[in-house]
């Protein structure tokens, strides 16, 4: 049964360690910038495939204590629950920064020590990349930029350490916020964190990476 908003968190439910937060749109609203190269059905399939991959990779990481998916979508929530995630409901028109800020407040109430924000469209994300970002000093802001260096594709911090920005030049905005708060910044640059699939060029890069991986496997046979 769906419950709107956040539920009170009792002391018995407190969960320390690193919480991962994955904000996910409703599938019918996702990946609209790929409409020129993918059908509506194909875009939804891509959305679920990447989201499932990200959630599964986070769940498998020994560095992640808990996983919270923020979404307005019943179908997305069903997929996330099946993978072992908790759900925090949000309105359909909620932006990523607001969704993540609400999640951070929920996690702070639950006793979470650190929060890792991860978008649901990172098809190359793996356990090593998660481990790398999670090794940021506890009192620092750990960040991973996207391919063009302007967006933030991964961020780890203490709850409430800085305000969150997930549109426009968010990578520099997060660095400026950390600087204003007197907090050190730890930057991780890797292909696994950098590639998010929003545009046709991103899809081409992903397809190229798959071909490269297959080629490497064949060369080892």
Curated annotation (Swiss-Prot):
GO biological process, one term: F420-0 metabolic process
Known catalytic reactions: (2R)-3-phosphoglycerate + GTP + H(+) = 3-[(R)-glyceryl]-diphospho-5'-guanosine + diphosphate; (2S)-2-phospholactate + GTP + H(+) = (2S)-lactyl-2-diphospho-5'-guanosine + diphosphate
GO molecular function: GTP binding; phospholactate guanylyltransferase activity
EC identifiers of the protein: 2.7.7.106
Entry-linked InterPro entries: CofC, Nucleotide-diphossugar_trans
Keywords: GTP-binding, Nucleotide-binding, Nucleotidyltransferase, Transferase
Entry-linked Gene3D superfamilies: Spore Coat Polysaccharide Biosynthesis Protein SpsA, Chain A
Pathway(s) it belongs to: Cofactor biosynthesis; coenzyme F420 biosynthesis
Keyword Manganese recorded: no
Function: Guanylyltransferase that catalyzes the activation of (2R)-3-phosphoglycerate (3PG) as 3-[(R)-glyceryl]-diphospho-5'-guanosine, via the condensation of 3PG with GTP. It is involved in the biosynthesis of a derivative of the hydride carrier cofactor coenzyme F420, 3PG-F420. Can also use (2S)-2-phospholactate (2-PL), with lower turnover, and has weak activity with phosphoenolpyruvate (PEP).
Family of this protein: Belongs to the CofC family.
UniProt-recorded name of the protein: 3-phospho-D-glycerate guanylyltransferase
Gene name per UniProt: cofC
């Amino acid at each position: 049964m769906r419950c709107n908003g956040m539920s009170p968190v009792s002391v018995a439910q407190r969960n320390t360690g690193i919480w991962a937060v994955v904000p996910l749109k409703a599938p019918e609203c996702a990946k609209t910038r790929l409409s020129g190269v993918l059908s509506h059905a194909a875009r939804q399939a891509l959305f679920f495939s990447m989201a499932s991959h990200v959630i599964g990779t986070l769940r498998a990481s020994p560095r992640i204590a808990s996983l919270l998916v923020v979404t307005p979508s019943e179908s997305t929530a069903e997929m996330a629950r099946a993978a072992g995630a908790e759900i925090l409901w949000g309105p359909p028109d909620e932006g990523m920064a607001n969704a993540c800020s609400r999640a951070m407040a929920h996690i702070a109430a639950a006793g979470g020590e650190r929060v890792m924000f991860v978008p649901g469209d990172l098809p190359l994300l793996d356990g090593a990349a998660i481990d790398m970002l999670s090794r940021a000093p506890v009192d620092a802001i750990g960040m991973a930029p996207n391919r063009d260096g302007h967006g933030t594709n991964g961020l780890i911090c203490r709850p409430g350490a800085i305000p969150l920005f997930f549109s426009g030049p968010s990578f520099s905005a997060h660095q400026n916020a950390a600087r204003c708060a007197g907090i050190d910044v730890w930057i991780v640059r890797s292909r696994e964190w950098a590639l998010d699939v929003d545009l046709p060029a991103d899809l081409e890069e992903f397809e190229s990476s798959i071909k490269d991986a297959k080629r490497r496997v064949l060369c080892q046979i």
